[in-house]
Amino acid sequence: MHPKEGAEQHVFSPVPGAPTPPPNRCGRLVLGPRLPAAGTPGPGIRAAAARHALPLWGGGATRRGRRPAGAAGGGVAARAGALGAARCRPPEAGRHRGGRRGPGPAGAGPVARGGGAGGRGGGAGRGGAGPRGHVLVQVPEAGAGRRALLGRYCQQTPAPGAERELRPAPPTGASASGRPRRPRRRASRAFCPRPCALPGRPGLTLLCRPRCRRQPRLRLPTDSLDPYSAPGRLPAHSVACPSDLVSAHPVLSFFPTAPASRASALRLPPGAPFALRVPLDLRVPPFAGPLAARPRAADGFNSPTPPWLGFVSSFSCSNSLKKTQNDPTNETSVFANPRQQCAT
């Protein structure tokens, strides 16, 4: 039988004080009386608490390496959903705090604050079942010791819905618990290379904290014609200059496209994000007249295929690429022409 790894796996006798049969018959030799003497006081709250691995006082050694009776720890650490260390150390677990294999103990405290829900297989004891009935937050086991328990990753998300909205709004400057909240630490301005300002009012930024460098906040410019006034934003179709968009595109700027003029941008349909221009040697001469006035193709239809694409289809369908025998008497062979034969 594997060593017991948490208080959940102990089987307690229904009568307190009556011993249970040992799990292996050879393991424990019970000598002396099997029942306590008459008049012995029954187990108090300390014994019941120790039996269920809930220490009454959380503190020092409870939260550090030694966890008495496999407890996750009381006090502040248990409130946020404590990391419980598994009590065995299989070799693949390394010296990892809260080992990866053995099921950890349950966190102390109410369920909505991360208590309960220990004892599962994959490095458990990391947080409890929240009010929605499943584990909401997985706490990473950083080597920071107690700071890993109390960071913002440990906070369990409250259940959405009615009880959040029916709660009266806290007074100004106070949190939901009533104590005054700490001033929020603003993100550094160095993360946002150009904080997006509302157009026309340079001092007033948007109602958002500056984003990180790689993912700026999405904003559609309304009245500015420059798509680079807000870098990284999606420009609106009517105000974007398509030549700037093509030249700034990471893929399309590689291809040699003729620059689209600003006048052609105004003729674009509103759904087209930019105008791709084909280089001059590939373009069909533009016919400005109506469809009936355009010159007809050889087949008599208005062929939508430009004439420079005609050789592509005929070339792919021809048999000239098929391998023929190199026979000089064969007129259809590759070297039938003597001048071509000399050239090769």
Swiss-Prot record:
Residues 101-131 have a biased composition (Gly residues). This is Laforin, isoform 9. The keyword Ligase does not apply. Residues 179-188 have a biased composition (Basic residues). GO terms for cellular component: nucleus. Residues 1-44, 58-134, 158-188, 320-344 are annotated as: Disordered. Keywords: Nucleus. Residues 77-88 have a biased composition (Low complexity). GO terms for biological process: negative regulation of TOR signaling; positive regulation of macroautophagy. Interacts with isoform 1 and isoform 2. It is found in: Nucleus. It comes from the Eukaryota.
